[in-house]
């Protein structure tokens, strides 16, 4: 039943992606047949320098997210705890750098131990993107500095990824991103997503998004994984949530998101957000539960 639902979800994403391309291409062809007037030419000529100057300006963004749960690629990284995630991004001429952290205010424990808040993660992302007509293309690098889940806990090894992304400036903005882990975990992660925004007025809009992923492991070692510490790659798991020496290779997780950005003043926006994450296959269900907090109810 889960595999059937996953197929329907992926088919829907694919159809929406193709629909977005079809809708934008048709108007583009019709516009090419229209003769260009002198007035239009003059307007374009004068607007281009202003647009170029606008694009040359450095950009910056600061944000703080308060979440009821930290879920990353389907994995439940926190449980019964509020997490705080500050983020800072700077950009210039297509280049950008982002620094993001995660503070777990009440680390999960199977016993009655009450751990104090713990800084569990700091991520650095460097990227470059460029637009070619309706096509957006980008490359990047991510360094995940991972901390122990609680005081006295075992610190997992840090992780590094490179990624390539392709997107279309069409309805639903279909985007495909391929991530490759190049340090300890040795896996590929492919993510296909669509999104759309409905602007109610200048201050309030509704943003909807959906994504589906595929995980391809290059390495699996059940003994190392069961020993803990974050080693052992991405193995496939049995229905009893036991690691095997088989590499995971299947559709992984889906995500549905809705947010309501509200612009309070010029530089301050509040965005209530709700997300629903779920496994796409039975293999993914076992793997996600075994690796996340759900394995320790």
Set out the residue ranges of the language-model regions.
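Outer-envelope beta-barrel architecture signal
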Residues: 54-62, 82-84, 93-95, 122, ...
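Glycine- and aromatic-enriched membrane insertion/assembly motifs of diderm outer-membrane
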Residues: 79-139, 143, 169-174
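Membrane-embedded beta-strand positions of outer-membrane beta-barrel proteins
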Residues: 62-66, 88, 97-99, 126, ...
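Surface-exposed strand-loop-strand hairpins of Gram-negative outer-membrane beta-barrel proteins
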Residues: 69-84, 103-118, 247-249, 282-293
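Solvent-exposed loop/turn segments connecting transmembrane beta-strands
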Residues: 73-81, 105-118, 131, 148-158, ...
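Transmembrane beta-strands of outer-membrane beta-barrel pores
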Residues: 66-72, 92-94, 101-107, 130-132, ...
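Cleavable N-terminal export/targeting peptides
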Residues: 1-59
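Outer-membrane beta-barrel transmembrane domain signature
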Residues: 94, 179-296
């Amino acid at each position: 039943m889960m595999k059937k639902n996953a197929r329907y979800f992926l088919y829907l994403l694919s159809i929406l992606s193709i629909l977005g391309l079809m809708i934008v291409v048709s108007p583009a062809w019709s516009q090419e047949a229209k003769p260009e007037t002198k007035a239009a030419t003059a307007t374009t000529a004068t607007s281009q320098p202003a647009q170029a100057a606008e694009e040359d300006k450095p950009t910056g963004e600061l944000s703080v997210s308060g979440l009821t749960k930290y879920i990353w690629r389907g994995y439940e990284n926190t449980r019964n705890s509020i997490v705080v995630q500050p983020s800072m991004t700077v950009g210039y001429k297509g280049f950008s750098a982002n620094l993001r952290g995660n503070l777990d205010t009440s680390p999960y424990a199977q016993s009655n131990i009450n751990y104090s808040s713990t800084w569990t993660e700091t991520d650095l992302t460097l990227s470059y993107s460029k637009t070619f007509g309706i096509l957006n293309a980008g490359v990047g690098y991510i360094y995940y500095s991972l901390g122990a889940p609680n005081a006295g806990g075992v610190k997992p090894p840090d992780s590094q990824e490179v990624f390539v992304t392709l997107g279309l400036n069409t309805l639903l903005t279909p985007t495909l991103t391929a991530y490759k882990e190049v340090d300890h975990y040795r896996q590929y992660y492919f993510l296909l997503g669509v999104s759309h925004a409905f602007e109610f007025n200048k201050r309030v809009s509704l943003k909807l998004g959906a994504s589906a992923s595929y995980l391809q492991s290059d390495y699996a070692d059940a003994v190392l994984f069961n020993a803990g510490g974050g080693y052992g790659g991405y193995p496939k798991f049995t229905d009893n949530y036991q690691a095997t020496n088989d590499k995971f290779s299947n559709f992984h997780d889906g995500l549905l998101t809705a947010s309501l950005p509200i612009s309070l003043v010029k530089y301050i926006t509040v965005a209530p957000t709700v997300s629903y994450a779920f496994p796409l296959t039975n293999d993914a269900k076992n793997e996600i539960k075994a690796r996340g907090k759900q394995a320790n109810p």
